[in-house]
Amino acid sequence: MADTATTASAASAAASASNASSDAPPFQLGKPRFQQTSFYGRFRHFLDIIDPRTLFVTEKRLREAVQLLEDYKHGTLRPGVTNEQLWSAQKIKQAILHPDTNEKIFMPFRMSGYIPFGTPIVVGLLLPNQTLASTVFWQWLNQSHNACVNYANRNATKPSPASKFIQGYLGAVISAVSIAVGLNVLVQKANKFTPATRLLVQRFVPFPAVASANICNVVLMRYGELEEGIDVLDADGNLVGSSKIAARHALLETALTRVVLPMPILVLPPIVMSMLEKTALLQARPRLLLPVHSLVCLAAFGLALPLAISLFPQMSEIETSQLEPEIARATSSRTVVYNKGL
């Protein structure tokens, strides 16, 4: 009876908010504002997720947002609250608080802080004339930041041993550093390259190093899913079973996303900078090289992140005919969905 009353209260609150505002779509607690079935809808959704303006939300504003959502949930919204205000409150809460623990995520490790705090690392990765020490440092710092973001935004509903995260972190660092150092040594020993060509090629070394490290991290962190399978749900959200085939699809989609993500970030800036460095402005004012380089990296990062994470929906759909026979027998639905993970 309590659940029914809560649902009725939320419906009443939704109707009240809907009447107060027709500009925004009707508010749904815990649901995305934009449709997740299209790439554009997912792109708009993730633009909200990574919006750096939420980094400047005050403690008072956060408490107000949380309270507004609680009022909506219990049907006690004050008159005049709009759908836009409710969507804004949910955006703030989701950007700052962990969905499972309701604890504040440390600012540099929030998704909204990924670009502001990650851009200096990208700039460091792409600096020309890297030494062995600087190559190792920037690759280590990049993988350390990625590991902290992954851990801070992990699924906390099930206890997970810290050893799993340490294993994934060490594997990513070792693969990134070894590939970056190895490629730099090969480029240095390539006698066919002119000094200018060698410098240009060296600028592209971070991409294969970071991409391979990202794949290594996904496999090491989530290999257990391949052995045990992941939950698949029907259209009503009911658990159908656990599927190893769905786990393979989830890991493939996640790995592909993590390869696509660094591509524009680590490939576009070297191309753009190689052209900008030839302009009269930068040749006459070499001190502008680093600021311009930083702006180019920031623009590439800001474009690449929402595009990459919008490639696949968070809840991916797959036909039961492609899964294990026991999954197909356990449901009358033609398709099921699974969470692909971060």
Swiss-Prot record:
Any one GO MF annotation of this record: citrate transmembrane transporter activity
Keyword Transcription: no
InterPro entries, A to Z: Mtc
GO cellular-component term (any): mitochondrial inner membrane
Subcellular location: Mitochondrion inner membrane
A Pfam family per the record: SFXNs
Transmembrane stretches, start-end: 105-125, 165-185, 256-276, 289-309
Region described as Disordered: spans on this chain: 1-29
Keywords: Amino-acid transport, Membrane, Mitochondrion, Mitochondrion inner membrane, Transmembrane, Transmembrane helix, Transport
Location (main, coarse): mitochondrion
Residue ranges with Low complexity bias: 1-24
Topology term for the membrane: Multi-pass membrane protein
GO terms of biological process kind: amino acid transport; citrate transport; mitochondrial transmembrane transport; positive regulation of cold-induced thermogenesis
Reactions listed under catalytic activity: citrate(in) = citrate(out)
Distribution of this protein across tissues and organs: Specifically expressed in the brain.
Entry's family note: Belongs to the sideroflexin family.
Primary role: Mitochondrial amino-acid transporter. Transports citrate. Does not act as a serine transporter: not able to mediate transport of serine into mitochondria. In brown adipose tissue, plays a role in the regulation of UCP1-dependent thermogenesis probably by supporting mitochondrial glycerol-3-phosphate utilization.
Protein name, entry field: Sideroflexin-5
Origin species: Rattus norvegicus
